[in-house]
UniProtKB/Swiss-Prot annotation:
Family per similarity comment: Belongs to the bZIP family. CNC subfamily.
CDD domains attached to this UniProt entry: BTB_POZ_BACH2, bZIP_BACH
Region: Basic motif, residue numbers: 651-667
Superkingdom of origin: Eukaryota
Statement: the UniProt record of this protein carries the keyword Nucleotide-binding: no
Pfam families attached to this UniProt entry: BTB, bZIP_Maf
Gene3D superfamilies: Potassium Channel Kv1.1, Chain A (3.30.710.10), Transcription factor, Skn-1-like, DNA-binding domain (1.10.880.10)
Native source species: Homo sapiens
Positions of the bZIP domain: 646-709
Protein name as catalogued: Transcription regulator protein BACH2
Known function: Transcriptional regulator that acts as a repressor or activator. Binds to Maf recognition elements (MARE). Plays an important role in coordinating transcription activation and repression by MAFK. Induces apoptosis in response to oxidative stress through repression of the antiapoptotic factor HMOX1. Positively regulates the nuclear import of actin. Is a key regulator of adaptive immunity, crucial for the maintenance of regulatory T-cell function and B-cell maturation.
UniProt note on tissues of expression: B-cell specific.
Amino acid sequence: MSVDEKPDSPMYVYESTVHCTNILLGLNDQRKKDILCDVTLIVERKEFRAHRAVLAACSEYFWQALVGQTKNDLVVSLPEEVTARGFGPLLQFAYTAKLLLSRENIREVIRCAEFLRMHNLEDSCFSFLQTQLLNSEDGLFVCRKDAACQRPHEDCENSAGEEEDEEEETMDSETAKMACPRDQMLPEPISFEAAAIPVAEKEEALLPEPDVPTDTKESSEKDALTQYPRYKKYQLACTKNVYNASSHSTSGFASTFREDNSSNSLKPGLARGQIKSEPPSEENEEESITLCLSGDEPDAKDRAGDVEMDRKQPSPAPTPTAPAGAACLERSRSVASPSCLRSLFSITKSVELSGLPSTSQQHFARSPACPFDKGITQGDLKTDYTPFTGNYGQPHVGQKEVSNFTMGSPLRGPGLEALCKQEGELDRRSVIFSSSACDQVSTSVHSYSGVSSLDKDLSEPVPKGLWVGAGQSLPSSQAYSHGGLMADHLPGRMRPNTSCPVPIKVCPRSPPLETRTRTSSSCSSYSYAEDGSGGSPCSLPLCEFSSSPCSQGARFLATEHQEPGLMGDGMYNQVRPQIKCEQSYGTNSSDESGSFSEADSESCPVQDRGQEVKLPFPVDQITDLPRNDFQMMIKMHKLTSEQLEFIHDVRRRSKNRIAAQRCRKRKLDCIQNLECEIRKLVCEKEKLLSERNQLKACMGELLDNFSCLSQEVCRDIQSPEQIQALHRYCPVLRPMDLPTASSINPAPLGAEQNIAASQCAVGENVPCCLEPGAAPPGPPWAPSNTSENCTSGRRLEGTDPGTFSERGPPLEPRSQTVTVDFCQEMTDKCTTDEQPRKDYT
């Protein structure tokens, strides 16, 4: 069935997330091994082997040049506008979707991309450069330095010879020196080793740097602080033991490169204090690849050591380009709209070249870290910064003897937090572990998005050589001997590095250790470090930009160490990257909210991880797929026992986490139900209490009415027959043998006597009430107050007071109380017509 045909019944569509990446990996491997390559490109007397289909698909220029060519081994010589330095990264981009950029080759790459009409690259990467690197709002460094650098971890005794070795340049060294534009904005120190050009050419190529005063250092560093609520607790926990390493904190801005002249005068260039932060841009976030400047990191101390832009030797013939010092000064005076990269280069052409003395190079290894100022707010960062012309005070050393150029202090845009939060959900598990290239310390690099789940990763054993103190520079930015100068200044700690919306690949060129990384995109090669050897910030020297549409989150990759090739095409002689799978560490974490706890942020023991596990599918499928689909996926791939064990462990932990979440939810539901029941019972209790009070009030009113009626009945008694009749209907009122009613000991009028009087009234008015035998058992109740009223009424009428005395024995002491039950019983049995009585009274 054709793909375009519409089936009669619904069809199941499987979309692979790694197919595109696998195709590119296979083509790149074929190109490096010269398999099925059908075209040879000659650029500046260098040969590049490639496939026509790939070139034609990426470039309109090659489409027009190669379509219709039937020759088997076609040789195409590119015009002089295309340089090897600019074409090399573009060719690698065509096969890997990753563009390696540095300040040395940005200009040539842009020129070559325009000439070759690689519009996809321009729309993605260069739009990013325009909005991020050259935005006058953010105050990022725009000056170029043609002095490229070597790898920072080569032996010092061999660095001098490698500086002069101009004939062994390969594309490996080319890619090693091509750091991405993030080095212009990242707050981490960026290492620049001695260039591979003669000293005289260095003096013309290097840009003179401003001399920064130390009196504004503290204020600038204080302005660089950002406080983000998400990492508040993490900051407090991680800044406890980092102050002793502050003497090695340096910046990742090339604007603070400075030369130490005899006059120490201010040179053209953007001072560190003038660097401002870029407000977040909310439009075209997906089309224009915007890079988050680690905006939600705690402070400047936590920024040192995240990413290092490691560079190797440049081309033998350096291109003498003008510095952008004038542009920097102009940018420092005004806040203009983002300028284009091409306009920047046109401006820089008019600037005079300034020589840099080869006898000395100022290092900033003793730059203190920014103090953790809790009082500063993000609004403080939007103020204008004064030029930073301080001297970092490191001893002068010869340029030949120095393998590293260090940079100024870190600065970060406070407004970028919103941008990071918007892109955070795209990559919740972008936690990166890269192998350590630094002999002194082996640390781990973590990149956390705005909703990244650090608690997952901290729940796992923390790798050895944890985060160094805030003061630790990147290895290249330290003017240390290779024997281990920094070892005494690196307290272990962990810290977050925000995930960026731009896929960035950090490629270490460090020789000794195997790289162990993990990616956040399921469309690229996946690898997951489970051992503790992974990663110091020192091991992340190179930044690669990937404009692959399937790469949504920041992707920090540490590819295999690339060795120089033997041919011109050997510049990309890498080990073929294998298809790897993303791993979500800490899947047994109790929560996916990504929130920090102080226990998590302080859990920094040095522990080892297991071996790296490479999977042919993204790790998300392990936890997301249903049971049947998961088993089918396992059967489709040939997996080793180690991989199976890892897969089942991840799935088991995921199930445990889900079960724990459900259990917590059930408990919360039970608690809520109990709370509802308690509220209902409380309301019912209040209702019953109010009803009881109402009943008491009604009962009191009824007793008052009964008392009045009993008094009237006693007042109406005229003869013994009436008393007998009253006694027959109301046995509680017995005649008393007392001589006078006054001899009866009156009791205070109470509810019980009122009830008794009421019974008398009922007995006279209603002839059906109570038989003598129906009286409740117990001693007869002799009313005191009521009988007193009755006898007193009779005495007033002239009745003989001895009438009652002959009726029975003397009144014995009686109980003066009647229970409420008796009252209710009598009330139920006796009925009265109260309305006439009320009218009568």
